[in-house]
């Protein structure tokens, strides 16, 4: 209930799922260490005002989408996002994917390689722009992902650990209408809701044209590598990406 403060009373779950809530990161001051502390970081999000009118445009929730959705899950179900995912999704599917990693698994991790430096002078940028506030609220480096606190934390938007097979196993639920083998996790009606367009235009954080449904982006001119159809996709650091084609029952 406290999330409704400071102009957020009309934010719906679909806005969290589609990066349209107006709360695309933490307001300053914030550190990477702050987001490891679930209670502190979700309280910070609850207290701040949105940076644009919710529902009017997308702005990629690069680090905090898992905290926003995860706290909804925790308030309803009582479990943390990582535990809920492990017990309700990864476990039934036999998928080797983890949100918050046990230290015993650290030896299996391939470290993320830092990207090249940006070819721009950061001092010339508008530090009050939504994009800069998002990517600096906070601004973890790739090297931080090599460290124990990051690996063990519950950061649903950014620190899932798995491999190509496990990502495909989880997304196969969407590609196959909510059911894989004997495991049914989603109804056909829920699958259809993924493709309810929530925002289509220049993303306020990425600065690129993006078409968002619920939880995924969908084909648009910003993704010319995709065919048309009921396809959901996204990607991340290190070249990771997933394409979910519901018409061909395929995940790539």
What are the roles of these predicted feature ranges?
Residues 242, 249-252:
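Short, well-ordered beta-strand elements
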Residues 219-221, 235-237, 245-247:
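Short, loop-centered acidic/histidine patches that primarily coordinate divalent metals
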Residues 72, 243-244:
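Hydrophobic beta-strand positions
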Residues 224-232:
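Short, surface-exposed loop/helix-turn segments at secondary-structure junctions
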Residues 154-161, 231-243:
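Glycine-rich phosphate/pyrophosphate-binding beta-alpha loops
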């Amino acid at each position: 209930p406290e999330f409704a403060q400071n102009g957020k009373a009309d934010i719906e779950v679909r806005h969290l799922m589609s990066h349209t809530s107006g709360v695309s990161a933490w307001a300053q001051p914030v550190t990477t260490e702050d987001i490891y502390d679930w209670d502190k970081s979700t309280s910070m999000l609850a207290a701040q005002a949105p940076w644009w009118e919710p529902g009017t445009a997308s702005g990629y929730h690069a680090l905090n989408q898992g905290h926003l959705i995860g706290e909804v899950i925790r308030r309803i179900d009582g479990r943390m996002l990582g535990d809920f995912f492990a017990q309700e999704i990864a476990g039934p599917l036999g998928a080797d994917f983890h949100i918050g990693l046990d230290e015993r698994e650290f030896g299996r991790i391939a470290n993320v390689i830092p990207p090249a430096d940006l070819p721009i002078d950061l001092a010339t940028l508008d530090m009050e722009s939504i994009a800069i506030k998002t990517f600096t609220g906070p601004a973890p480096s790739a090297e931080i992902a090599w460290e124990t606190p990051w690996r063990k934390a519950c950061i649903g938007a950014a620190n899932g650990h798995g491999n190509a097979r496990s990502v495909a196993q989880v997304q196969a639920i969407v590609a196959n209408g909510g059911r894989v083998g004997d495991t049914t996790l989603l109804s056909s009606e829920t699958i259809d809701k993924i493709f309810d367009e929530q925002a289509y235009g220049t993303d306020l954080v990425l600065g690129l044209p993006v078409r968002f449904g619920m939880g995924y982006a969908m084909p648009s001119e910003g993704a010319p590598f995709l065919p048309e159809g009921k396809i959901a996709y996204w990607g991340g650091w290190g070249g990771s990406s997933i394409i979910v084609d519901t018409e061909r029952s395929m995940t790539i």
